[in-house]
Amino acid sequence: MAKITRALISVSDKTGILDFARELAGYGVEILSTGGTAKLLRDAGLAVKDVSDFTGFPEMLDGRVKTLHPKVHGGLLGMRSNPDHVATMKAHGIEPIDLVVVNLYPFEATVAKPECTLEDAIENIDIGGPTMLRSAAKNNADVTVLVDPADYRPVLDEMKASGGAVSRETNFCLAVKVYQHTAAYDGAISNWLGARTGEGIAAYPDTVTLQFRKAQEMRYGENPHQGAAFYVERQVKEASVATARQLQGKELSYNNIADTDAALECVKQFAEGPACVIVKHANPCGVAVGGTLLEAYDRAYATDPESAFGGIIAFNRELDADTARAICDRQFVEVIIAPAVSPEATEVVAAKKNVRLLECGTWPEKQQPRLDLKRVNGGILVQDTDLDLYAELKVVTKRQPTEQEMKDLLFAWRVAKFVKSNAIVYGKGNMTIGVGAGQMSRVNSARIAAIKAEHAGLEVKGAVMASDAFFPFRDGIDNAAAVGITAVIQPGGSMRDAEVIAAADEHGMAMVFTGMRHFRH
C-alpha cells in the first residue's frame, strides 16, 4: 500500500479525533474537513483545508450539500492501479483522498428524545457522510476508511510500523465495518419513519431491518460447545433484561438471560400486589402474590422447592432486606431481578458474591406492542408479542364460579401464558400449587401438575386449573376432578367442547372460556 498523504475528516462523535489528527499531521498528511470538525481542528492549531476550498464549490442549502462533489468522490473512488482512472483524475484536477474518517449525524440519539419532531429527525439524516463512507469502502484497495474511534489507535500503530501506510487486509476489514455501520444507520431510519406510516408495528414490511447492537460476548451459548453473544435492540426503553443494570455477581450466561427474561415478563402480569416468579429452564415453577414481597416469595418457593434450586427469581416490587435474606438463607439462586433493590438488600446479597443481582426499573401497566422473532433454518418467523389476556370470559357450565374461584382462575390463566405448551397450571389463593409444562399430551401435563402439588405437600382440593389451549377430550377434566379441581379456565374451540363441558357439569365444576389461546413454544 502507498503512504497516506491526504485525509478527509468529518465527525459528529469527536471522541479522540484531536489526538488522531495530530498524529496524522506528524506524518505530513494533508487534512481536509468541514463545519464543526474543521473548526475544532483549526482551533487546536492544526493546518486544515476546508472541503469547499478543495472542491472550489461552497457549502450550501444550510449545510445539506458539503461533500457531494466529483472532486471528493472521484478522489475516493479512483483506482490508483487503473491507468484510465489516473488519467481521468489528472485531466479533471481530481486529487486522491487516501483516508476518510467519518461518523454520522446522531439520528438515533435525536429520535430517542421525547420532544423529537419529524422535522428534527429528518434534519439528522446524514447524506454526505454515508455517501463518503460507501465510496471509500468500495475502493478499500486504495482507501482507508474509519467509522469507529476505537480503530484510530490500531491504524496509527500500523502507519507507524509501515512508514505511513495501511495494509489491504486492514482496509478490507474496516470496509466491512463501514457497511455494517451504514446498514444499521439506514435500518434505524427506516424503522423510525416506518413506525409513522399509520400502520405501525402491525405492518409486516417486505424486508425486516430490525437493528441490534452487541452488548456482551459470552463464554458459551446454551451448551458449552456453542458460541454466543447478547445483542440488544436499539432504542429499547421498557424495563427488561436488556436494559437491566447488574449490581453484582458473575457475568450473565446465555441461559441466565433467557430465563431472566421469562421470569421478568411473567411477573409483569401481576399489578395487584407484591408478586414473585421463580423460573427454571424458561418455565415458571412457582408464582405467587402476597401481602408482602417476602410472603410472595415464600409462597412461590413453596410450589416447587426442588425445582427452585438454581432458579431465577423475579419481583414486581423493590427487593427488601428481609426477602433477600430469606432467599440467600434458603436456596441457591442464579439471578434475582427486581424494579429496584434497597441498599440493605444489596448488602445482604453481597455475602453471596456469585449471585447475579439485577435492577431493571419500573414498567408501565400497559406494555407496548413489539415483534417476536424465532429463528428457523433459512429464515425467521415474525409475530406480534402475545400481550392480550383473553377475548371474553364466558361461563359455559351450569355452575358459575365463585368470586374466589374467578380470582384464582384469572391468576392461573396469567401464569399459563408463560408456561411451555402443553401448559397446565393449578392455582389457589393467588399462588401456583402445581405446574405441568411442555408435555406432548395435555392430560399428561395435568397429571404432572397434580404430582408436583402432592410432592410439595400442597392441597389440590378446591384449587382451579388453567390450560393454555382447549381440551381435545374430556380426560383432562376427569383427571382434574379426580384430584379435587373445582373450576377450569381454557380457550375453548375444540370439536368436542360439548363433551368437555358435559364432563365438567358431571363433576359439578365451573368452566370459563376465554376465546384466546396462549401456545408457547
Curated annotation (Swiss-Prot):
Gene Ontology biological process terms from the UniProt entry: 'de novo' IMP biosynthetic process
Pathway linked to the protein: Purine metabolism; IMP biosynthesis via de novo pathway; 5-formamido-1-(5-phospho-D-ribosyl)imidazole-4-carboxamide from 5-amino-1-(5-phospho-D-ribosyl)imidazole-4-carboxamide (10-formyl THF route): step 1/1; Purine metabolism; IMP biosynthesis via de novo pathway; IMP from 5-formamido-1-(5-phospho-D-ribosyl)imidazole-4-carboxamide: step 1/1
UniProt keyword list: Hydrolase, Multifunctional enzyme, Purine biosynthesis, Transferase
Keyword Transferase: yes
GO cellular component terms given for this protein: cytosol
Domain of life: Bacteria
Example GO molecular function: IMP cyclohydrolase activity
MGS-like domain sequence ranges: 1-147
Reactions it catalyzes: (6R)-10-formyltetrahydrofolate + 5-amino-1-(5-phospho-beta-D-ribosyl)imidazole-4-carboxamide = 5-formamido-1-(5-phospho-D-ribosyl)imidazole-4-carboxamide + (6S)-5,6,7,8-tetrahydrofolate; IMP + H2O = 5-formamido-1-(5-phospho-D-ribosyl)imidazole-4-carboxamide
PROSITE patterns: MGS (PS51855)
InterPro entries: AICAR_Tfase_dup_dom_sf, Cytidine_deaminase-like, MGS-like_dom, MGS-like_dom_sf, PurH-like
EC number: 2.1.2.3, 3.5.4.10
Keyword Hydrolase (UniProt): yes
UniProt similarity note: Belongs to the PurH family.
Stored NCBIfam families: PRK00881.1, purH
Domain notes: The IMP cyclohydrolase activity resides in the N-terminal region.
Protein name: Bifunctional purine biosynthesis protein PurH
Source organism of the structure: Geobacter sulfurreducens (strain ATCC 51573 / DSM 12127 / PCA)
Gene behind this protein: purH
